[in-house]
Amino acid sequence: MAGVPVFMRRILLTLTIASAFIGMNAPASAETITLVADEWCPYTCKPDSDKPGLFIEIAKKVFAREGIDVTYKTIPWARAIEETRAGKYTSIAGASIGDARDFIFPTEPQAQSVMTFYVKYGSRWTYQNLASLDKISLGTIVDYSYSNLIDSYIAKNKDNMRLVQQVGGNNALESNVLKVIKKRVGATIESAAVMEYYLATQGRTGQLIAAGAMPVNDDQNLYIAFSPKDPNAKRYARIVTDGTRALRQSGKIQEILNRYSLTEEKVSR
């Protein structure tokens, strides 16, 4: 600082010290994870809405305890799995183990799905066993897992449109409902909570009716599952496990369910 007046040296020194102090005390950028799913309300609903979905509200609560921010977007389910598997996103929300067996799962499920068959009102068909499916064409969604038994049936018959018809995209549920109504398929299979929520909110209550369900077992557990490419996946899975247990023990999870007119008995054993 040769040649700089003394008073200017003091100002520059003060500014340097102040800048260093501010830098030392500036908050670090918050850690952020990105969840993706298709629209599968009430589990995963529209982003940025007052009711983004059960899984999104659970995720935000459990990660907030760790100072981690959560962002959420909806894309078709097949893409959600593929791009999260590749490491583009952190996690898929509302997944069963059968959806993506290579992902990192919490040990505590966030909910459960009772996979139920639905037919057009007036239909006499009901699900009895796999043999009963031979009498209809079943509407399903690409890359969904419905239970080990039904997944195997779909894989075996996916190229036989008389038995299995698959749809994808953001409006897959609506597509299957319309196909049942128009008798393009004899039945569709869907989570009871999802189908009942859809029919009620779309003014279609009574147009489709339940016609049997799969036995409730661990095949139907649903999770927030993490990308196998993410180095923090195991840590995130532990956070979700511990956080979900804490929400259940405190009764906070029922407060979330109340917002979607659900009881824990309906989404959990």
Predicted regions and their residues:
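Sec/Tat signal peptide C-region and signal peptidase I cleavage site
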Residues: 24-30
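A bilobed periplasmic-binding-protein/Venus flytrap-type ligand-binding module shared by bacterial periplasmic
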Residues: 116-126, 219-234
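Extracytoplasmic small-molecule ligand-binding "clamshell" domains
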Residues: 30-103, 169, 250, 259-263
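Acidic, polar ligand-binding/catalytic clefts
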Residues: 60, 72-133, 143-146, 213-214
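Extended ligand-binding regions for polar small-molecule ligands
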Residues: 56-65, 131-137, 144, 224-259
